[in-house]
Amino acid sequence: MKIQCDVCEKAPATLICCADEAALCAKCDVEVHAANKLASKHQRLFLDSLSTKFPPCDICLEKAAFIFCVEDRALLCRDCDEATHAPNTRSANHQRFLATGIRVALSSTSCNQEVEKNHFDPSNQQSLSKPPTQQPAAPSPLWATDEFFSYSDLDCSNKEKEQLDLGELDWLAEMGLFGDQPDQEALPVAEVPELSFSHLAHAHSYNRPMKSNVPNKKQRLEYRYDDEEEHFLVPDLG
């Protein structure tokens, strides 16, 4: 039993166009799918691969059934399939397959090839099966140690600065400008005027008691101003 071409309705069909859902002979296939590039990409299934012995249709029981409806769980011929699954009806959305297990009205060949390639490509499966690689953890920031060293350097610099400041103020401390008890060397010593030998002899001559006619007159202390310097003379009591 052969399937008739849906275009010319004279020659037997050699293939089925899934996009057009039509059985075509070789001549009509060239005319229909050579019209444009989009039509040339339609997926087509050759009927040579189908079995020559088809089961009878579950509805009419006369014609050979090569369409299987999943929802109705029935094998249908083309005429019964069109009558049962008419467009704009609820049954039009039923899933239907050819007797070989290939779904009817699939998308274009290029789309199916991409789907099959992604589905059966071992490289894609390996990429999907591989767990996501964990990125190495970023190194912990070194701000704590840097801050510690910076603070230590700051403390050292402050200590050195204090030592320098104290070193500069040592000479003020030696002069007794602060409230601390000064050293004995820093205290000013009262200087005793140095007298030359001539001054001492001259002073000794003045220390001698002068003879006076007045016996009861008391001895007086005399002061002598020499070179605009005041000298205190101790009387000789011997």
Swiss-Prot record:
Purpose: Acts as a negative regulator of seedling photomorphogenesis. BBX25/STH and BBX24/STO function as transcriptional corepressors of HY5 activity, leading to the down-regulation of BBX22 expression. BBX25/STH acts additively with BBX24/STO during de-etiolation and the hypocotyl shade avoidance response.
Disrupted-gene phenotype: Reduced length of hypocotyls.
Main location: nucleus
Zinc finger residue extent: B box-type: 5-47, 57-99
Gene3D superfamilies: Classic Zinc Finger
Chain spans, region Disordered: 115-139
GO biological process, one term: regulation of DNA-templated transcription
Subcellular location field: Nucleus
Any one cellular-component term (Gene Ontology): nucleus
Effect of D20A: Abolishes interaction with HY5
Recorded consequence of changing D72A: Abolishes interaction with HY5
Binding site for Zn(2+) 2: C57, C60, C80, H85
Ranges for region Interaction with COP1: 226-238
PANTHER family: B-BOX ZINC FINGER PROTEIN 22, B-BOX ZINC FINGER PROTEIN 25
Molecular-function GO terms, alphabetical: DNA-binding transcription factor activity; zinc ion binding
Record's subunit section: Interacts with COP1 WD40 domain. Interacts with HY5 and HYH.
Protein name in the entry: B-box zinc finger protein 25
Biased amino acid composition, Polar residues: 121-137
Record key words, sorted: Metal-binding, Nucleus, Repeat, Repressor, Transcription, Transcription regulation, Ubl conjugation, Zinc, Zinc-finger
UniProt-annotated binding residues for Zn(2+) 1: C5, C8, C28, H33
Posttranslational mods: COP1-mediated ubiquitination and subsequent proteasomal degradation of BBX25/STH occurs in the dark.
Organism: Arabidopsis thaliana
